[in-house]
Amino acid sequence: MPLLTESTRILLELGDRGFLGANLGRLARVLALSGHAETAAELVSRGEAMHAEIGVDPWLVTFNDETRALIRARLDEPAYAAACERGRALAPEAAVARALDTLESATNRTRAGTG
C-alpha cells in the first residue's frame, strides 16, 4: 500500500490526470474491500470524471465496473448515488486527501485491533 499512496501523491504533484484517475480507482477498490464503501464510491466517481475529460483505457473500465459492484453490494441506492455525486464534485487534491486519510485511519484501526 505504501507504494500506491506514494505514487498517488507524486501523480497529483505532476498533474498526471490519467494515472491519477487510475490510482483513485485502485484506492477505491482497497477501501471498498475494507468497509469504506461511501468513500470508495466518491473516489471511483472522481477518477471516472477525470477520465471522461481525457479518455480511458478499456482495462480501467472493467476494473472500475468490478469496483462499483463491490461498492453497490455494500450501499443502498440513495447512499451510492449521493456518494457518487460528492465524488464527481471533488477536486483531485481533495479526492487524494480523502483517499489517503481514510486509508490511514483504516490502517491505524487495524493495527490497534479496533477495525
Describe each PLM feature range.
Residues 1-115:
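Intrinsically disordered, low-complexity regions
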